[in-house]
Amino acid sequence: MLSPSNILVLSESDYWQRDTDAEFVIQAVISLPPSSEIGQQQKFAWPWEWDGRDAVPPVVPDSEDDDIPAPSQPVYRLQVRGTSDLEVVWEIVQPNDDVDQLSAAVRRKIGVVRLGGDDRNDRDLRLVYGSALDRLLADKGLRARIGQRVSEIDLQDNLGEDAKEALEKLDKSLKEESLPNKLELGLTSSQGLSIGALIGLLAESDKGVPLPLASWGAGTRRMATLRIAAATEAETRITVIDEIERGLEPYRVRKLVKSLQTEPTQSFVTTHSAVAISAADLGHLWYLDRACNIGALPREKIARQQDRDPETFLSRLAIIAEGPTEIGFVSYLLDRAIEGELLDQGLRVCDGQGNPATLGLLEAMVAGGLSFGGFADNEGQSPERWGAVKANMGALLFQWDEGSTEENIVALVDENQLTELIKNEDGLFDPERCLTLATRLGIEDRSVETIVDKAPDLRALIIAAATGSKEGAPDQDAEKTWKKHGRRWFKSEAGGRELATKMFALGVWPALKPQILPFLNAVRAALGQSEIQDVAHE
């Protein structure tokens, strides 16, 4: 849309579904200063009013005597259109919806620095029209002076004898056909070609040899291009970088992202780098999901996740699990429900960092119209917000009807098998778990037999210890100690997996299958896998 040249070739593949009759339009709302020369077009470009979300027409005067309304925050609506004839048309849309031509001069003044594929990265390092180097030097007469000096070279005298003879034969042939003759070689120009394209920046290597910057590594070329653009005193420069991590080490990616955020001009960046996402703490993230939906992610709701686990936003499908227990529990189930390795399928189970944070993160995904999964406890808080998220996510969000994962599993274990929960993965009674139970009972004897004998309700005691409940603690110090009890049970990823293992081993799965299986099938469907009737387990 902001190409500095009118020379742009389209093909059928540039159109949606290769349907050229449908044409295409790319439109943007841009704030432009007077230095962009937007007001010097053949037809005056009237500004729109920016209302905080979109460009709207300015307030219409009440009568003919009123002054023309001046927008408090003027913006312009620019667009590029691909016609059914495979032609490109640059236009500016007026507030009354009239469309006028957008000149190449204005587009060149705006100045786009584009870093795409490696084959295009040297454009801004050469003296072609509209390049970063061209805008930096801003010497309009340079090409003419270079052309004049080149034209002074007598090309005819530098030809070999065979070449001179071939040229004479051609001249004679043209003369016989009454065509222009008396041929000689000289400097000519052609549409799309410029003598400036042969001129570029050179830099000394370690050996002191001047080498074209275009021949250096991809990362070095990109960094050099951005430095050239930054040296240009332009108020409207727009930087577009595809895969910012290309050719750069992680520390340089981090440095580049931080640098772009401090620039007064705007940058658009695509990335598959967790380092880049984590470093963009001042940027606005937009996410493209597996269904090709693109949506904005509110910074205030994703900031913690962006910093701690940026790979959340790079997965084919991310499942936001409330905490470590849920991560381990869900991972165990998905390992058995999904065909193939989870990571190979692009499936990532992420830590939502608590119930409120998980809700906020899922709300951000829903607001962006994006596809994510979720697995959370039901703490009885914000039921309306959870209901709204559930209505949008459907079966991809699993939330217990009541309580936590530990509560729901332990509640269904047979009375005669409750002591099996006290055992560790080796099948032995875990002394630390016994200690948590004895502490809550206020007894010194940590034997399982004594604990069972003294506990008025063993199930409730295990649930309290496994969840780190502080209820009933005699003092504040005891509250702190009791709160940590959950770590001795299932408050970890390994503990979540252990809990899932015991769910199957102790016969709890059949009772929970109607609740959990729809969630697992929703994840399978998101990955393009067919529905299953049960989960394989030992």
Regions found by a protein language model. Give the residues of each.
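Short hydrophobic beta-strand that contains or immediately precedes a catalytic carboxylate
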Residues: 215, 318-322
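Extended helical coiled-coil dimerization/tether regions that scaffold
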Residues: 90, 124-127, 131-224, 228-238, ...
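Conserved P-loop NTP-binding catalytic core
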Residues: 1-70
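Electropositive, glycine-dotted interaction segments
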Residues: 39-148
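Switch/communication elements of ASCE P-loop NTPase nucleotide-binding domains
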Residues: 1-4, 194-195, 201-312, 328, ...
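Acidic, Mg2+-coordinating catalytic modules of nucleic-acid enzymes
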Residues: 313-318, 327-538
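Hydrophobic positions in the central parallel beta-sheet of the AAA+
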Residues: 113, 239-241, 319
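Conserved catalytic network of the ASCE P-loop NTPase/AAA+ motor domain
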Residues: 17-22, 69-71, 105-108, 230-234, ...
